[in-house]
A protein has these predicted regions:
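Intrinsically disordered, low-complexity terminal regions
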Residues: 1-254
Length: 254
């Protein structure tokens, strides 16, 4: 687990470096707050325009660091608000835009949560999601952007329309499952070599491959496959329209 965590942290640092390269035209304003969260507490975040990066850590605290970036007018920064509802067992963050159009502001989030927090939902419309070293991740949703999970646990449901889905699931209980869906993009799922799961894949315009042995059970429709990893167990659903699907072995690194 430590090796996976170190790798996830390194990848997260690289991701954050990419997040903080703001456009040269950007007029920005920062937001920094911390909120206590009880062990096993929940966290959710809804964004509109901008990347969200979440990293697990050893503190029972949620740290929210955000940068609002306006394309044209500094006054637009005040028209986009970051609202937080913080309770001892649940923290919720949301980006709110004014009802009228014409406000070109993005919000880039960097979040730290306890490793054992429950990620209830994280979503954005235009931007990517990156999650690392969180044991319980539930719902991830993007429209135009990639979804990446490193050293994560389920039950995990990730959906994007225009983007790739890449997930490293280091631990998955029998009652958990994984669902990864995209319309225009590829799906890559990394699992431990001893994973026991029921696997269902569907890729309309692309190929499927697996480094783990798959015992084929049926192909109910063209481009759809049902099989088992090991003895079978937790349900895994992988779907894409325009792209390929790969199941690979999760490899430890130092």
């Amino acid at each position: 687990m430590l090796r996976h965590t170190l790798r996830a942290t390194a990848l997260f640092i690289l991701a954050i470096a990419a997040v903080w390269v703001a456009p040269s035209y950007g007029i920005s304003k920062e937001f920094d707050q911390q909120y206590p969260l009880a062990p096993g507490g929940s966290f959710e975040l809804q964004n509109v325009n901008g990347t969200v990066a979440v990293q697990g850590w050893d503190r029972d605290v949620v740290e929210v660091h955000a940068v609002k970036i306006a394309k044209h007018r500094e006054s637009d920064l005040e028209r986009v608000s970051i609202e937080v509802d913080a309770k001892p067992t649940a923290v919720s963050v949301a980006t709110h835009y004014p009802p009228d159009e014409g406000v070109e502001v993005s919000v880039e989030y960097t979040i730290h949560v306890p490793h054992n927090a429950r990620i209830e939902h994280i979503g954005t419309v235009n931007g990517s999601l990156r999650i690392a070293s969180v044991d319980n991740v539930e719902e991830l949703h993007a429209v135009n952007g990639n979804i990446e999970v490193f050293d994560g646990g389920g039950p995990l449901h990730a959906h994007t329309t225009n983007g790739n889905v890449q997930m490293e699931v280091a631990h998955m209980r029998d009652k958990d499952g994984v669902t990864a869906e995209t319309t225009n993009g590829s799906v890559i799922l990394a699992l431990p070599s001893d994973t026991q799961a029921d696997l269902e894949t569907r890729c309309m315009n692309g190929s499927f491959s697996s480094e783990l042995p798959v015992r084929m059970e049926s192909t109910l429709r063209p481009r759809e496959m049902h099989g088992k990893l090991g003895r079978g167990g937790a349900p895994i659903h992988l779907r894409t329209i325009n792209g390929g699907i790969r199941v690979v072995i999760l490899r430890s690194t130092v």
